[in-house]
């Protein structure tokens, strides 16, 4: 078995914990390049850590999302450095023992893994990674007299059409992120649904929860271009008229370690 570690960049506490973990576990450990440089060790790019059996992310949800995108479907264990931490269930004080315990259980073949759905966007000229949090389909810019014409369908049945700044489709994981700021609902992680939320629509429909086995299509027109963004990091332009298809991705995010105390994390949103 091999363990990979990704630590939040420019964060001495994260690097310190990475060093403690690698010295404690009794399996080969590979560090991401930036962490390895801090510890004067050999490292590799984060994508190559997908060859490991388990990857430990040390930081906040952003670090976890970055690691999960790069190494999926390799399981990820998140160590939370005091942020909201909807994805990171392990505290710094418990991380060394927790990682060692998960490694032992994985070696014995009895580790429990939680799987979270990802969202895949496809369409003309699109080349986007699967999204852990959300996919946004946006006009050239937001605001009055901007946006684009949209037609949203679920398995071919019409949900909404009209002028809007865009459409946001969120996973349960992403429901506490961009989706929440756009007025969408929080979705419990045990609920297998995507959330469709229009963004500043002229005739807005309420947000819609859609089973993850359904296909969502967004037809866009009425603008010189549209932008499709996965998790706010990777963007691609499409030329209207065009249709973007959103469906559950082939590979889920797999989380190792203790299960998240969801309602405890919600308290930190205040």
Swiss-Prot record:
It catalyses: NAD(+) + ATP = ADP + NADP(+) + H(+). Coiled coil: none annotated. Its EC number is 2.7.1.23. Keywords: ATP-binding, Cytoplasm, Kinase, NAD, NADP, Nucleotide-binding, Transferase. GO terms for molecular function: ATP binding; metal ion binding; NAD+ kinase activity. Its main location: cytoplasm. The active site is at 61 (proton acceptor). One of its GO terms (biological process) is NAD metabolic process. NAD(+) binds at residues 61-62, 133-134, 144, 163, 165, 176-181. GO terms for cellular component: cytoplasm. It is found in: Cytoplasm. Belongs to the NAD kinase family. This is NAD kinase. It comes from Natronomonas pharaonis (strain ATCC 35678 / DSM 2160 / CIP 103997 / JCM 8858 / NBRC 14720 / NCIMB 2260 / Gabara) (Halobacterium pharaonis).
